[in-house]
Amino acid sequence: MRMEKTTDKPLSAGDMNDEYSRGPIDDIDCLNFFERAVQDPCCEACDTEDADEELRAKLSSFNFQPDSSPCNAKCQQTLNPLCKIDEGLPAESELAPSRNGSVSEANSDTNSIASTVHDPVDSKYGGMPSLRKAKTTSYFTSSSSNNTTMRNPLKKCNTNINGLLVNRRSSSSSRQSIPELFSGACTKKKNNVLLKSETPNSEFSTNSLQHCNSRSFSLPRSRSRSSAIAIPTHLYGLEKYVSPELDTLTADPEESIERFSNNRPREISSCCPNDTGDTSSSLSHSNTSSSLNFPLGTNTNQFHQPRQPVQQQQSSKPNFGAGRKKSFIEMSLASSFAG
C-alpha cells in the first residue's frame, strides 16, 4: 500500500536525479545492442573523428518502444524530456554543466559509448579489427614480396643468357681459330711456290699457286662442309696437333737437330753435280713430296734452300715435329688438311 501511494505522488528532485541517472544506463545497453547489430566489423579503417556527433544524432533519433513493465514506463517518461533537451539545445549547451547534472552525465555516457564502440581490443566484436589490420599489413608487404619474387626469375634469366653468350663466344672463337691456321699454312705454301718459281718448271708453280689461292679463298665459304673445321679442338684436346707452337713443346729438340743434320748433306750431294733440268725435276719432286708428307705444323722452307750452310740451318728453328712418331689423329688431320 505504501508503494502505491508513492507512485501517485509527484517525484521529488532527488527521485528525478535517480531516475535520470538510471535512464542513460538502459540507453547505453540499447545502443550497444544497436551498434553490435549494425556496425561492420571490418570498417575500422574509416575516419572516426566525428564519431561523437554521429552517436548524438543516433541518440536523438532513436525511438524507445514502451513495454508493459512499470520500470520501462518510468524510463520512457524520464527519457522523453532528455530527448527534448538534446533536440532544443545547441551543441555548446550540451557540453555545458546543468543544475541537476543529467546532461553532463549523458554526455560522459556518450563519450564512454564512443570509446567502447570504437575500441579495437574490445572482446564484444570478436577481435575482427585486429584481423583486418593483419590483412592490410600483409597486403602492403605483399608488394615487396612480389618484387623479390619477380627479381629472382629475372636474375635466373640473366644468368642463363650470359651463359649462352659465353658459350657462343667460346664456340665461335674455337671455330675461327682453325681457319686462321689454314690461311697461315696456305701463305707458307704460297711462299714456297714463289721460291720454286725460279726453277724452269713455271707451269707447275703457277698451277700450285692457283690451287693454294683457291683453297685459301674457299675455306671460309665451306666452313660448315669440311669435317676438320667442325671438330671442337678445345673439347678433345687436339690443339697440340693443330697449332705448331704447342707441337714444339712435346718434341725433343736435340733429336730433331741430329736428324736434320743427317738428312741435309744427302740432299746437297744429290743436287750439286747436275745443273740441268734433271736437278729441277728432282727438286720439284722433293718439294712436292715434302709438302704432301709433312703436316701443316712442320717447317717446309728448309727443303727449298739447298745452298745455305748447315750451321745456319742448325742455328735456325729446327723441325720439332719430325723427332717423334705420328699419331693416328695427326695423320688423319694432315690428310684432311691436304685433301
Swiss-Prot record:
Residue ranges of the region described as Disordered: 1-20, 93-156, 199-224, 258-325
InterPro entries for the chain: Mbr1
Residue ranges with Low complexity bias: 136-149, 214-224, 279-293, 302-314
Subcellular localization(s) per the UniProt record: Mitochondrion
Record keywords, A-Z: Mitochondrion, Phosphoprotein, Stress response
Modification type Phosphoserine: residues: S177, S224, S227
Biased composition (Polar residues): 99-115, 199-213
Residue numbers of Phosphothreonine PTMs: T159
Gene Ontology CC annotation, any one: mitochondrion
Location, primary (coarse class): mitochondrion
Family stated for the protein in its record: Belongs to the ISF1/MBR1 family.
Function (record text): Participates in mitochondrial biogenesis and stress response.
Protein name: Mitochondrial biogenesis regulation protein 1
Lineage of source species: Eukaryota, Fungi, Dikarya, Ascomycota, Saccharomycotina
The gene coding this protein: MBR1
